[in-house]
Amino acid sequence: MALYEMNLSVILFLIGILGFVLNRKNIILMLISIEVMLLAVTLLVLVSSYSFDDILGQTYSIYIIAIAGAESAIGLGILVAYYRLRGNISLRQ
């Protein structure tokens, strides 16, 4: 049963990598792709924790989600400062 969830996690991670590589112009889409990759890893940690009947993986996933939230807040703060400085958020001008 856990094999389906692990495959889903790998597919989500590959979608995140693909989104990051293909959207090199838009910073917001790059941040979203990084978040998708991080949440795919979190899903893999949760599934592995459930498979091995270990609660430590669940606590790690809570930490990963908290760090992802902080990373998103910092990234969006930097993005707002970049927009105020340059007037647009495009990487290529």
From Swiss-Prot:
First-tier enzyme category under EC: translocase
Gene assigned in the entry: ND4L
Alphabetically ordered keywords of this record: Electron transport, Membrane, Mitochondrion, Mitochondrion inner membrane, NAD, Respiratory chain, Translocase, Transmembrane, Transmembrane helix, Transport, Ubiquinone
EC numbers for this chain: 7.1.1.2
Membrane topology value: Multi-pass membrane protein
UniProt protein name: NADH-ubiquinone oxidoreductase chain 4L
Location(s) in or outside the cell: Mitochondrion inner membrane
Similarity comment: Belongs to the complex I subunit 4L family.
UniProt cross-references to NCBIfam families, sorted A to Z: PRK05715.1-2 (NF004320)
Pfam families: Oxidored_q2
